[in-house]
Amino acid sequence: MSHSSLHPSIPWPRGHKAKVAAFVLLIVCLAALWKLGEPSDHLLQWLVLHLASLHLRLLFKRVCCLAEELCHIHPRYQGNYSRAVRACLGCPIRYGAVLLLSCYFYVSLPNTVDLPLTWMLAHLGLSEALNILLGLQSLTPAEISTICEQRNFNVAHGLAWSYYIGYLQLILPGLRARIHTYNQLHSNTLQGVGSHRLYILFPLDCGVLDDLSAADPNIRFLHELPRQSADRAGIKGRVYTNSVYELLEKGKPVGTCVLEYATPLQTLFAMSQDGRAGFSQEDRLEQAKLFCRTLEDILADAPESQKNCRLIVYQEPTEESDFSLSQEILKHLRQEEREEVTMGTAGTFVAPGSSTLHQEPELLISGMDQPLPLRTDIF
């Protein structure tokens, strides 16, 4: 499966298919050269010279980058020149080894092309200078995305961690106690499988409304949970609150839950609307998906938080679709109910005999897909 369990459009991290393709390309090229009957010494010389030229071109490029970094040596590297050199040139041992090996083969093997070393170096420098000036070797969007994902440079990564540490990690541990207090005050309004969880809505288009009833009139605000306060970043008694909503179906209440949007999606939407952020709608969609995936990974490593919340990820509907947000939420609630019933099938089925009618009623747990009725006269 190449996507997250939250939603089919959320991708998993990239794998190693590029290396697999490179290995296949290596085998194909070696087979082609072997079939052409290329002499091994001639093949080795050209291969070494080509590898050396690639590394030399890369070295020229990084030296040009070093010229820029030296202008920022104090604010970026605290005046440490060796850090600046390592940041631009990478490992000097690797370059030294490649250059020494290349010089050895250049001297020891016959020079069939009859070109002096100085001429070759000058042409390499010329070609790399043109590449830099014309921008011919810029990274593709896929390469940039891969680097950002691997090194956690994405906007989504910071937003997900900020959302978890600054909000979810604070409210989720005490959520059940607050729901219990709420039920005591409101005649057990929150009941059922989803009564002890926070349901977080993730519209992938980042369309977050301040009023859920405006998104769907079948979602009706009921009450606020008891508030939670904490001293946070110099703010004494900072208040955190959550809202209880009632879900309607055909005009009748069919469920209640603690519900809200993921607020960082508002930040992504605002960035895409502000030209100063340089954030396109495509960037917004990509970062929204990565935000969901990153938060899913964070919660997977925090079981106490994970069991107290559920993420509801969905695509905003088109004009032709009959999408209903309330039905999407109800689908998740009912799915959890079915999962609870399925988990209960591991229990033992107890069938009361004729002599047990005077005893206290016992819970009947079915081994079927649907729960059995509690009446026994129909068996």
UniProtKB/Swiss-Prot annotation:
Catalytic activity: H(+)(in) = H(+)(out)
Residue positions binding 3',3'-c-di-GMP: 162, 167, 238-241, 263
InterPro entries in UniProt: STING, STING_C_chordates, STING_C_sf, STING_LBD, STING_TM
Modified positions (Phosphoserine) in chain numbering: 355, 366
Positions bearing the site annotation: Not phosphorylated: 358
Residues recorded with modification Phosphothreonine: 356
Membrane topology per record: Multi-pass membrane protein
Superkingdom, natural source: Eukaryota
Record region (Cyclic dinucleotide-binding domain (CBD)): 153-340
Transmembrane segments: 20-40, 87-107, 115-135
Any Pfam family the entry gives: STING_TM
Domain writeup: In absence of cGAMP, the transmembrane and cytoplasmic regions interact to form an integrated, domain-swapped dimeric assembly. In absence of cyclic nucleotide (c-di-GMP or cGAMP), the protein is autoinhibited by an intramolecular interaction between the cyclic dinucleotide-binding domain (CBD) and the C-terminal tail (CTT). Following cGAMP-binding, the cyclic dinucleotide-binding domain (CBD) is closed, leading to a 180 degrees rotation of the CBD domain relative to the transmembrane domain.
Function: Facilitator of innate immune signaling that acts as a sensor of cytosolic DNA from bacteria and viruses and promotes low production of type I interferon (IFN-alpha and IFN-beta). Compared to other mammals, STING1-dependent type I interferon induction is strongly reduced in bats, suggesting that the cGAS-STING pathway promotes a limited inflammatory response. Innate immune response is triggered in response to non-CpG double-stranded DNA from viruses and bacteria delivered to the cytoplasm.
Protein name: Stimulator of interferon genes protein
Source species: Eidolon helvum (Straw-colored fruit bat)
